[in-house]
């Protein structure tokens, strides 16, 4: 079998969802049924394979994306399939966090994966982080299948969950399984492709399951959903469509072919159900992974930039192409040091070879290559297109970098990282901890690009910035556990931003004469607001040599640096454009540095007069509460400047959706616990930046002046 043909039996998938929807439990069952694990780990016992960090086992949540490889031989009683030789599929799985503070782990995993299992809580349905993960998958056009989990739980409602997928995710769910029973009577599923019931044994940890005829009380419903299934899927294949409208019977293989085609193209999303904790539905989920999610061969050619020509090119995902890969994660392993996870897009990679990091123009030697199973590892000598492996000892490579062969150098599309929304001041408990803190943060930031740390040049105070309170709490924990560094931690602070609301043109001259060589630079810059999310843009419209082109990078550099300290309260300035339209220079006294200084002073003057405003992060908050506490909870959200968007009943509880400034949400978990006697719960995700009220802006400016 050729290497490229083997690729058709590889699946690179992620498992993602809202916290507590059952992602890690589902993954643990997959590892058990595929023979990777000989016992089933449980989140509540702290014995899971995929959650291997101490903080993960202590808290019962997934923090880092753990990678593992398993193999699956599909069990099939379909005559067309059974006559063929059984084929083993290689499945590379990345289990991602569901907590909003670790969204970056989800994003960078999706960037290198070909497909995703979206796990939904059968009781809660589509939750806020489910939406966030879904939008990230949309961004990278990752094909998905859905698994409605926890069908054994009180309040589980498969059909409500499917409707929520339509309403909240804007997707087209394709139901390919129906639950048999509900809550404590749930015992299996109806397979709408085979038109058979599948029932799991309560013994052998669900390893055995049998096919039965469809229960008589479900015939009408099954026929209805089967009709909907066929009407949807035949649209993707003209030949099969013609057979269908001619009333010819469609084979299972035909139906699967159509589902696969539609799922990979994103026309619809197959929906399955089960209970991972009760060991029901996982084997059929694995079958769906190999049937309906793409192999590397199904992925379109990758886009890249040729280093020599700087032109955009495409490269086939093939073993026959030159080697290229993207580094999507770096971790520090206590036994082997730095581990760099890569997804190989083309060609082959052998240990002992030399490659080039084209992002940084640095050569790297591949001394050791590992297949990872959570924190266990297996040495390998060669990896090929489609593989996800870990490399040890890379000196220059960090997350988002491209590595490729020396003979054909390209740069792949980078991974985008979210900006921090919260910060903490940290200081060493003892002078001896000062250097250790810096060293620890350098290593942690290399692993996690959403972690940023800075040192105030005036106070020498160190500030760490991240995606939420839990994110920074975990960082402090890891500094203590892994690096033996004790730190005093300040109260959390919001990472505000600044922007402008109107255009303003500045004509600024920087002139300095101190005997000897002087400094001279004149710049004329238009500062204008941009739409939300546009960031910073610089454009030069200099013509006729008013400013020599070698000095223009100095203007851009000056603006890039100064925009990080805005004029309102010292926060980064975003969503504006600076257009250099004129200027002048001196033959002797002008320099790149002089134009850098001129640009910085022009920024201070121009932004001050362009209607500067302070922006704060707004969070989308979902609160689930028993009816009797609704009044107090809504009153509290209103007192936090919250805007209630909707309220919807769910059994004897209510779901409140609101937008609330992050600065008003610190310590909310304690307040909510007190208001509801511990019975309500909440989750929140970052939504957008919004102008803060005048009173809050004045408070922040007053703090800044102290």
From Swiss-Prot:
Q: Which residues bind GTP?
A: 17-24, 95-99, 149-152
Keywords carried by this UniProt record? Cytoplasm, Elongation factor, GTP-binding, Nucleotide-binding, Protein biosynthesis
A single MF term (Gene Ontology): GTPase activity
The record's InterPro entries line, in alphabetical order, gives: EF-G-like_DII, EFG_II, EFG_III, EFG_III/V, EFG_IV, EFG_V, EFG_V-like, G_TR_CS
Which Gene3D superfamilies would you find in this protein's record?
3.30.230.10, 3.30.70.240, Elongation Factor G (Translational Gtpase), domain 3, P-loop containing nucleotide triphosphate hydrolases, Translation factors
Q: Which residues form the tr-type G domain?
A: 8-297
Keyword Oxidoreductase present in the record's keywords: the answer is no
Q: What is the lineage of its organism?
A: Bacteria, Pseudomonadati, Pseudomonadota, Alphaproteobacteria, Rickettsiales
Function of the protein: Catalyzes the GTP-dependent ribosomal translocation step during translation elongation. During this step, the ribosome changes from the pre-translocational (PRE) to the post-translocational (POST) state as the newly formed A-site-bound peptidyl-tRNA and P-site-bound deacylated tRNA move to the P and E sites, respectively. Catalyzes the coordinated movement of the two tRNA molecules, the mRNA and conformational changes in the ribosome.
In the UniProt record, which is one GO cellular component term? Answer: cytoplasm
| Matching SUPFAM superfamilies | EF-G C-terminal domain-like, P-loop containing nucleoside triphosphate hydrolases, Ribosomal protein S5 domain 2-like, Translation proteins
Similarity comment text for this entry: Belongs to the TRAFAC class translation factor GTPase superfamily. Classic translation factor GTPase family. EF-G/EF-2 subfamily.
What name appears for this protein in its UniProt entry?
Elongation factor G
Q: Where is the protein localized?
A: Cytoplasm
Pfam families, A to Z? EF-G_D2, EFG_C, EFG_III, EFG_IV, GTP_EFTU
- Superkingdom field: Bacteria
- Chief place where the protein resides: cytoplasm
Q: Which residues form a coiled coil?
A: none
One BP term from GO: ribosome disassembly
What is the species listed in this Swiss-Prot or TrEMBL entry?
Answer: Orientia tsutsugamushi (strain Boryong)
């Amino acid at each position: 079998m050729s290497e490229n043909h083997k690729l058709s039996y590889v699946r690179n998938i992620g498992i993602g969802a809202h916290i507590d929807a059952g992602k890690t439990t589902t993954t643990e069952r997959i590892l058990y049924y595929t023979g990777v694990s000989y016992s089933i780990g449980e989140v509540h016992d702290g014995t899971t394979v995929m959650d291997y960090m101490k903080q993960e086992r202590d808290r019962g949540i997934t923090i880092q994306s753990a990678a593992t490889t398993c193999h699956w031989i599909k069990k099939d009683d379909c005559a067309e399939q059974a006559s063929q030789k059984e084929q083993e599929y290689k499945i590379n799985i990345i289990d991602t966090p569901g907590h909003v503070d670790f969204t970056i782990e989800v994003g960078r995993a999706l960037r290198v994966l070909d497909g995703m299992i979206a796990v939904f809580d059968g009781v809660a349905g589509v939750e806020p982080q489910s939406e966030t993960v879904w939008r990230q998958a949309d961004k990278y056009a990752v094909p998905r299948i859905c698994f409605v989990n926890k069908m054994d739980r009180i309040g589980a409602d498969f059909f409500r969950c499917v409707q929520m997928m339509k309403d909240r995710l804007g997707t087209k769910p394709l139901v390919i399984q129906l639950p048999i029973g509900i809550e404590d009577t749930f015992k299996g599923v109806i397979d709408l492709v085979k038109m058979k019931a599948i029932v799991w044994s309560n013994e052998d940890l669900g390893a055995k399951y049998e096919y039965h005829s469809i229960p008589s009380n479900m015939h009408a419903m099954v026929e209805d959903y089967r009709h909907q299934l066929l009407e949807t899927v035949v649209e993707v294949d003209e030949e099969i469509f013609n057979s269908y409208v001619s009333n010819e019977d469609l084979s299972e293989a035909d139906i699967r072919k159509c589902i696969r085609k539609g799922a990979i193209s994103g026309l619809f999303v197959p929906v399955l159900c089960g209970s991972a904790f009760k060991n029901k539905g996982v084997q059929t989920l694995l079958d769906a992974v190999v049937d309906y999610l793409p192999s590397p061969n199904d992925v379109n050619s990758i886009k890249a930039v040729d280093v020599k020509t700087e032109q955009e090119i495409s490269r086939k995902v093939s073993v026959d192409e030159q080697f290229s890969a993207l580094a999507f994660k770096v971790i520090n392993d206590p036994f082997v040091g730095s581990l760099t996870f890569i997804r190989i897009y083309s060609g082959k990679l052998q240990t002992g070879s030399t490659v080039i990091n084209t992002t940084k123009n640095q050569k790297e030697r591949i001394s050791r290559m590992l297949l990872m199973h959570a924190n266990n590892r297996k040495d390998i000598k060669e990896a090929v297109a489609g593989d996800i492996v870990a490399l040890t000892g890379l000196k220059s490579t960090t997350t988002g970098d491209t590595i490729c062969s020396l003979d054909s150098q390209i740069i792949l599309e980078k991974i985008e990282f979210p900006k921090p929304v919260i910060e903490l001041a940290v200081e060493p408990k003892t002078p001896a901890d000062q250097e250790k803190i810096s060293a620890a943060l350098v290593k942690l930031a290399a692993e996690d690009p959403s972690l940023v740390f800075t040192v105030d040049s005036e106070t020498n105070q160190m500030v760490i910035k991240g995606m939420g309170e839990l994110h920074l709490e975990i960082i402090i924990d890891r500094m203590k556990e892994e690096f033996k560094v004790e730190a005093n931690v300040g109260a959390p602070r919001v990472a505000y931003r600044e922007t402008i609301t109107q255009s303003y043109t500045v004509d600024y001259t920087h002139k300095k004469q101190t005997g000897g060589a002087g400094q001279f630079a004149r710049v004329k810059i238009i500062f204008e607001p941009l739409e939300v999310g546009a960031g910073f843009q610089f454009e030069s419209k200099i013509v006729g040599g008013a400013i020599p082109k070698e000095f223009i990078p100095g203007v851009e550099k000056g603006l890039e640096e100064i925009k990080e300290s805005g004029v309102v309260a010292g926060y980064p300035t975003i969503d504006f454009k600076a257009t250099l339209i004129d200027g002048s220079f001196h033959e002797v006294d002008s320099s790149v540095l002089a134009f850098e200084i001129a640009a910085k002073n022009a920024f201070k003057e121009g932004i001050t007069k362009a209607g500067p405003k302070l922006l704060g992060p707004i969070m989308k908050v979902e609160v689930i509460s028993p009816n009797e506490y609704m009044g107090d909870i809504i009153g509290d959200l209103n007192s936090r400047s919250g805007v209630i968007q909707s309220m919807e009943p769910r059994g004897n509880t209510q779901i409140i959706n609101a937008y609330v400034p992050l600065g008003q949400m610190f310590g909310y978990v304690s307040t909510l616990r007190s208001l509801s006697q511990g019975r309500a719960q909440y989750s929140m995700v970052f939504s957008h930046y919004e102008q803060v009220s005048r009173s809050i802006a004045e408070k922040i400016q007053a703090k800044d002046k102290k």
